[in-house]
Amino acid sequence: MIYFDTSYLVRLYYQDAGADAVRALAATDHVASAAHGQAEMIAAFHRKLREGAVRPAAYAALLGQVQAHIEAGAFRWLSQDAEVFSRIRQVYQRLPRSVFLRAADAMHLATAAESGFSIVYSNDAHLLAAAQHFGIQGKNVIGQTPVPHQNSAHLQNE
């Protein structure tokens, strides 16, 4: 199983730069993400509608496709429990002031770390830079050729 943040989830459905590389990586394993990633993904699609990057019919089709995949179990949505929020508090307590870490990114990183993932895939430079503070590695395959991984390479303990 591999962990995607929202920047990668969006590329599974929308042809942003790097979408082909993200889709190729997704084809190598099952995809997991924090449960709040669903809301972030839908919000990103709505932003594209608001900004005129997609038309209303395409927006409706995107939402329908996402809903169908969610109902089919295409993703493993990871919940945030007390351990996740404890991890977030601990990281922020010792986080250097120079590190830019948004709350939603902290939720992704803590969720992944507490769920046993050792790698988070993202195209978000701030999230990637902060990953080490959660004891995990951030990777970006955009502009690279993804290498298929075995499930155990992504989970420390499942």
Identify the residue ranges that each predicted region occupies.
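Structural signal for conserved beta-strand scaffold positions within catalytic alpha/beta enzyme cores
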Residues: 33, 79, 140-143
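Active-site-proximal, substrate-binding regions of enzyme catalytic domains
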Residues: 42-93, 133
